[in-house]
UniProtKB/Swiss-Prot annotation:
Complex and partners: NDH-1 is composed of at least 11 different subunits.
PANTHER family: NAD(P)H-QUINONE OXIDOREDUCTASE SUBUNIT I, CHLOROPLASTIC
Main location (coarse class): membrane
Annotated protein name in UniProt: NAD(P)H-quinone oxidoreductase subunit I
Protein EC: 7.1.1.-
Pfam families per record: Fer4_7
Species this chain originates from: Crocosphaera subtropica (strain ATCC 51142 / BH68)
Gene behind the chain: ndhI
GO molecular function: 4 iron, 4 sulfur cluster binding; iron ion binding; NADH dehydrogenase (ubiquinone) activity; quinone binding
Stated role: NDH-1 shuttles electrons from an unknown electron donor, via FMN and iron-sulfur (Fe-S) centers, to quinones in the respiratory and/or the photosynthetic chain. The immediate electron acceptor for the enzyme in this species is believed to be plastoquinone. Couples the redox reaction to proton translocation, and thus conserves the redox energy in a proton gradient.
Catalytic activity annotation: a plastoquinone + NADH + (n+1) H(+)(in) = a plastoquinol + NAD(+) + n H(+)(out); a plastoquinone + NADPH + (n+1) H(+)(in) = a plastoquinol + NADP(+) + n H(+)(out)
4Fe-4S ferredoxin-type domain boundaries: 55-84, 95-124
Length: 196
């Protein structure tokens, strides 16, 4: 008889312990249900990185003195700095600057040791591309344009195709009443309306 009572007592203890463990597990589950979700719907929601996040490097062309400190402190000698010596000013002039973010380890040494603070880390972390060559950012992709738009070798032929006579780069240099080499869209519409 005592053996049956002992078995019933052990069964009751086991039941109480099982209920306790189930209750602990459910309390953890309900606690997590009340919390804010950890994941975000990425393309539509974006996490805000911390203040000292090391993202894509921003480069300011006008501040760079072509000292190449960034190349010397980089563990993989990554930044490509092309410069030429200006004999009149007796100093280096930067011609081209590029960084390949497919190889960069984002250590931040170049930013830390730059004497003119022309390099800085941004909070941009979306650097995905279909082709690895697209991750090679030149001075235009890293920051703002290196020269005036009127001196850009890509813009010069386009401007000559447009509305100014050949060789004239600024509309302010034209005398009043001079003919343009092309027609503006408004002029084309006016001619079409006049002929119909």
């Amino acid at each position: 008889m005592f053996s049956i009572l002992k078995q019933v007592g052990d069964y009751a203890k086991g039941t109480v312990e099982a209920a306790k463990y189930i209750g602990q597990g459910l309390s953890v589950t309900f606690d997590h249900m009340r919390r804010r979700p950890v994941t975000v719907q990425y393309p539509y929601e974006k996490l805000i990185p911390s203040e000292r996040y090391r993202g894509r490097i921003h480069f300011e062309f006008d501040k760079c003195i072509a000292c190449e400190v960034c190349v010397r402190v980089c563990p993989i000698n990554l930044p490509v700095v092309d410069w030429e010596f200006n004999k009149d000013a007796k100093k280096k002039e930067l011609k081209h600057y590029s960084i390949d973010f497919g190889v960069c380890i984002f250590c931040g040494n170049c930013v830390e040791y730059c004497p003119t603070n022309c390099l800085s880390m941004t909070e941009e972390y979306e650097l995905a591309a279909y082709d690895r060559h697209e991750l090679n950012y030149d001075n235009v992709a890293l920051g703002r344009l290196p020269y005036k738009v009127t001196q850009d070798p890509m813009v010069t032929p386009l401007r000559e195709l447009g509305y100014l006579p050949k060789g004239v780069m600024s509309p302010h240099d034209l005398p009043e009443g001079s003919q343009r080499s092309g027609k503006r869209p408004e002029e084309i519409i006016e001619e079409a309306e006049a002929s119909s």
